[in-house]
Amino acid sequence: MRRAVCPGSFDPITNGHLDIIGRASKLYDVVHVAVMINQSKKGLFTVDERIELIREVTADFGNVEVESFHGLLVDFCKQREIPAIVKGLRAVSDFDYELQMAQMNNGLSGVETLFVPTNPTYSFLSSSLVKEVATWGGDVSHLLPPTVHEALVKRLGER
C-alpha cells in the first residue's frame, strides 16, 4: 500500500492545501494529513477544530486520514510506516526551506519528499494571508472551502 503524509498547521485549511491533498490522494493509496501541534503559537482554531474542518473538506477523497502530531515529522512517519512526505511549493522561496527539510528528513530516517508545484491559482495563498485579509473585512470566500469560510467568519466575529 502506497502511503504519504501532507503535514502542516492548516490554520485554517485553504483551497491551496486542499488542492495539494487532492492531488496526493490520486498518487497514493492513503494520504495522512498531519496537523502540527505547536505549543509556542496560539492558533485561530484549536487543533481539534482544524482536524474536524479538514475531515469535512477531504471526506469525498475517500483515502485521507487526519490526525495531529507533535515533534519530528519523521517520527510520525516511522510510527505509521509512511515512506513519503508530500509538500506543495508556491515559489522559489519555499523551495530553499523545503529542500533543507527534505534533506534533513531523508538523512534522519530515509523518508522521501515529493514536491508538488502549487496550482498557479493558489501560488500566493497562505493561511496567514487569509486570516489577515479576513480580519480586516476582506472577502476570502473564494480562497477557502465553504465550511471553512463559515467557521472563519464565525470565529472572527467572536473576537
UniProtKB/Swiss-Prot annotation:
The residues listed in the UniProt record as binding substrate, with positions renumbered to this chain, are S9, K41, L73, K87
What residue stretch is flagged as signal peptide? none
Catalyses which reaction(s): (R)-4'-phosphopantetheine + ATP + H(+) = 3'-dephospho-CoA + diphosphate
Q: Where does ATP bind?
A: S9, F10, H17, G88, L89, R90, E98, Y122, S123, F124, L125, S126, S127, S128
Provide the protein's localization. Answer: Cytoplasm
- Under the GO molecular function aspect, what terms does this record hold? ATP binding; pantetheine-phosphate adenylyltransferase activity
Enzyme Commission number(s) of this protein: 2.7.7.3
Q: Where is this site: Transition state stabilizer?
A: H17
Instruction: State the Gene3D superfamilies in the record.
Output: HUPs
User: Chief location of this protein?
Assistant: cytoplasm
Give me the Gene Ontology terms describing cellular component.
Answer: cytoplasm
Q: Which family does it belong to?
A: Belongs to the bacterial CoaD family.
Query: What HAMAP family does its record include?
Result: PPAT_bact
Subunit structure as annotated in this protein's UniProt entry: Homohexamer.
Q: What is this protein called?
A: Phosphopantetheine adenylyltransferase
According to the entry, what is the taxonomic lineage of the organism? Bacteria, Bacillati, Actinomycetota, Actinomycetes, Kitasatosporales
